[in-house]
């Protein structure tokens, strides 16, 4: 199931601090369903960090369905999320998607969160 993000369920950080990255992610990949998700402590608070079926990382508030940020992971970031989720490896279809994303849109790697 795709994730719908609009002005009511996204934080200022996502669309005010990083508008170009968010626009490109929406344009190139969209916000698809979460395949692997972990809890992670960010800036003293826990958040949900998920890898989507499009190969994008979406970070969401723990207690609300609000997006904090999204970014295109490199291979190590994807592996780390899967390891923390208890998986031995990134699911093969997702791994191929991430590698294609990196080949097609390497500029997004430099738009960090």
Model-identified regions with their sequence ranges:
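Ribonuclease/tRNase effector modules and their secretory precursors
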Residues: 1-113
């Amino acid at each position: 199931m795709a994730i719908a993000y609009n002005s009511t369920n996204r934080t200022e950080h996502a669309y005010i601090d990083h508008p170009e990255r968010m626009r490109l992610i929406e344009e190139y990949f969209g916000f698809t369903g979460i395949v692997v998700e972990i809890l992670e402590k960010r800036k003293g608070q826990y958040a949900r960090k998920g890898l989507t079926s499009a190969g994008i990382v979406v970070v969401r508030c723990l207690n609300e369905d609000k997006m904090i940020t999204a970014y295109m992971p490199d291979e190590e970031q994807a592996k780390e999320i899967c390891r923390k989720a208890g998986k031995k490896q990134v699911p093969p279809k997702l791994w191929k998607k991430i590698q294609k994303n990196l080949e097609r849109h390497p500029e997004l790697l430099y738009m960090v969160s």
